[in-house]
């Protein structure tokens, strides 16, 4: 288990990087965030959580929510029902690409790009009577924090700027790979992205990825095999088009969001969440990646 002093040192060492990235501005509600925030939290498989910096300040988790939605789908569907509609390969295109959807006849490359996450949201909408409420129940239970909520301002802001995601959904619908009402699914999807959580919440919530599918309270959420498979997908496709660089520098399965958060896991040991709102050119937290690289090096840990 790393000590708090180590996490504080990691935060201090990356602070000079502040100012080198750019806060996401295509969602107006995200553009107003203080770019100088830095936080890190670690939860070990014995249930202990420590943190440093702004690790208790909530932020918009954005695409990190795609891990929760895929996990929820895995508890509701046979795997063939999921993987017949979305692939398992890295994209190589931007996370909101229409071109790839067209070229591959409506089947998204993986569940962590927007097209793939929209298919997963469509699956959840088909199977659940109240998909937004069910997601909130899940993340509150996983993080053991019943104050986790949706940021309605962010969800509304995303909906008002949803033309591209709507285009992706309608394009997939034209290929027969989208069943529900596009507007309804989009509203659910944007609420998932607008979950507000802090680094401590997320490191606790993602512990099942490090603990063979078992949550903080010991409940089996998904199987050991499913957990291994999910971590494999995170290692290859969790960081948009920066997955290779992240694997090289950090060496952990991970998932980023344009809110500046990144979650990562060392299977069998710990889950970690970092947050710094300034992004690199790939849309991943610049200082966040550096914090994970520092932590990986200091602990001498990598999955490779």
UniProtKB/Swiss-Prot annotation:
GO terms for biological process: glutamate biosynthetic process; glutamine catabolic process. It catalyses: L-glutamine + H2O = L-glutamate + NH4(+). Substrate binds at residues 63, 114, 158, 165, 189, 240, 258. The keyword Glycosyltransferase does not apply. The keyword Cell cycle does not apply. One of its GO terms (molecular function) is glutaminase activity. Disulfide bonds: none annotated. It holds the Pfam family Glutaminase. Its EC number is 3.5.1.2. Keywords: Hydrolase. Homotetramer. Belongs to the glutaminase family. This is Glutaminase. It comes from Shewanella oneidensis (strain ATCC 700550 / JCM 31522 / CIP 106686 / LMG 19005 / NCIMB 14063 / MR-1).
């Amino acid at each position: 288990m790393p000590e708090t002093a180590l996490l504080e040192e990691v935060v201090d060492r990356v602070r000079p990087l502040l100012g080198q990235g750019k806060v996401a501005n295509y969602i107006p509600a995200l553009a107003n965030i203080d770019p100088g925030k830095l936080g890190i939290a670690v939860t070990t498989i014995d249930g202990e959580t420590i943190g440093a910096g702004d690790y208790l300040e909530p932020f918009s988790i954005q695409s990190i929510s795609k891990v929760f939605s895929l996990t929820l789908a895995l508890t509701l569907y046979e795997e063939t029902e999921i993987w017949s509609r979305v692939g398992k390969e890295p994209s190589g295109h931007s996370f909101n690409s229409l071109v790839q959807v067209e070229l591959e006849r409506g089947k998204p490359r993986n569940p962590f790009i927007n097209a793939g996450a929209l298919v997963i949201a469509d699956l959840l909408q088909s199977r659940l009577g109240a998909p937004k409420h069910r997601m909130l129940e899940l993340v509150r239970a996983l993080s053991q924090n019943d104050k986790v909520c949706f940021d309605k301002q962010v969800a509304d802001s995303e909906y008002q700027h949803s033309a591209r995601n709507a285009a992706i959904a309608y394009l997939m619908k034209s290929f027969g790979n989208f069943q529900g009402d596009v507007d309804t699914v989009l509203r659910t999807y944007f609420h998932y992205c607008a979950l507000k959580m802090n680094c401590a919440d997320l490191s606790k919530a993602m512990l099942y990825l490090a603990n063979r599918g078992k949550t903080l309270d010991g409940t089996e959420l998904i199987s050991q095999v499913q957990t291994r498979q999910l971590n494999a997908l995170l290692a290859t496709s969790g960081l948009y088009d920066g997955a290779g660089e992240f694997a090289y520098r950090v060496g952990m399965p991970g998932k980023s969001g344009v809110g500046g958060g990144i979650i990562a896991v060392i299977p069998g040991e710990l889950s970690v969440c970092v947050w710094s709102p300034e992004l690199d050119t790939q849309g991943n937290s610049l200082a966040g990646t550096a914090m994970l690289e520092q932590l990986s090096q200091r602990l001498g840990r990598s999955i490779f």
